[in-house]
Every structure is written in structure tokens, then in C-alpha cells.
């Protein structure tokens, strides 16, 4: 798994979730423009095996989670328009693990999601006004256990 460290000027918010899995970090130089969410089951079920692919160009990509035994059967591609300013969703237990079960991304122009089951404990990563999310970090293994955001001034 690729590991990229955030620039020293970036602030962090989060992570939310549990401490299972291994740490990952994605802080591209270019703006985020696409997030691919992969699920096992249908998109209205849980993100029990979510695989999140963040990208800012064809060569600056990281995929986290989704390495468990269930096949990934559904993919949702989110083409980001604007600056991401908030991440929210649900954390809930799945097979004994507290994991990210649904997720929503909000930009200064629109909302994307929520994707996954609307059940569990809500979480919200909202950054201070005048800033934008420029990268993500967290823990993952079979599941996306935790997620946080790097942010900087617009």
C-alpha cells in the first residue's frame, strides 16, 4: 500500500472509527477529483467491505480496505466537483469489528451520498470555514476501520 505523508502545513481532523487494520495516508499534490467506492452486496447495504479509491490524476491513486473474503460486487464512482469540506457517515459493528458502514462527501457545491447503510453511530468530519479537505488518512484491512482528513486554507 502506498504511503504518502501530508505536508507540514496541513491540519488534521479525525480520525473517526476504530483502531483496527493498518495506518494509511493519502495526500496528493493535485486536487482530489475522483473517489471510487466498492461494496460487497448492494449499494443500500452496509459498506462491510468498502474499498475506497482516492485519485487526483491517473498516477496518484490509493485504494484502502476491501481485502476481506466477500467479493466486491458494486462500484460507485464519485467525480468530485468543488472543494470537499465535510465527510460524514455511520460507524457500526460488522462481524465483531467497528467499521465505516456508510459515507457521504460534501463539497462547496453539492453532496455525494450517503453510500451504504444508514444505521449505526453517526460521525462528522467538518473542517473550519475557509478551508478545504486535501487528503485522507485512517486505518484499514478487511474493512475501512477509520477515516480522517487533511485540510488546508482555500
UniProtKB/Swiss-Prot annotation:
Expressing tissues: Expressed in leaves (at protein level). Expressed in leaves and to a lesser extent in petioles. Not expressed in stems or tuberous roots.
Binding sites annotated in the UniProt record for a carbohydrate: 21, 97, 141-145
Subunit structure: Homotetramer.
Residue numbers spanned by region Involved in regulating the binding affinity to carbohydrates: 1-10
GO molecular function: carbohydrate binding
InterPro entries, alphabetized: Jacalin-like_lectin_dom (IPR001229), Jacalin-like_lectin_dom_plant (IPR033734), Jacalin-like_lectin_dom_sf (IPR036404)
UniProt function note: Lectin involved in defense reactions of the leaves in response to wounding by herbivorous insects and pathogens. Retards the growth and development of silkworm thus reducing their survival rates. Has hemagglutinating activity against human erythrocytes.
PTM section of the record: The N-terminus is blocked.
Entry similarity comment: Belongs to the jacalin lectin family.
Protein name: Ipomoelin
Presence of keyword Transferase: no
Induction (record text): By wounding of the leaves (at protein level). Expressed in unwounded leaves on day 7, indicating factors in senescence may up-regulate the expression (at protein level). By plant hormone methyl jasmonate (MJ) in leaves and to a lesser extent in petioles, but not in stems or roots (at protein level). In leaves, both local and systemic expression is induced by mechanical wounding. Increased expression is detected in wounded local leaves after 6 hours, but expression decreases at 12 hours after wounding.
CDD domains: Jacalin (cd09612)
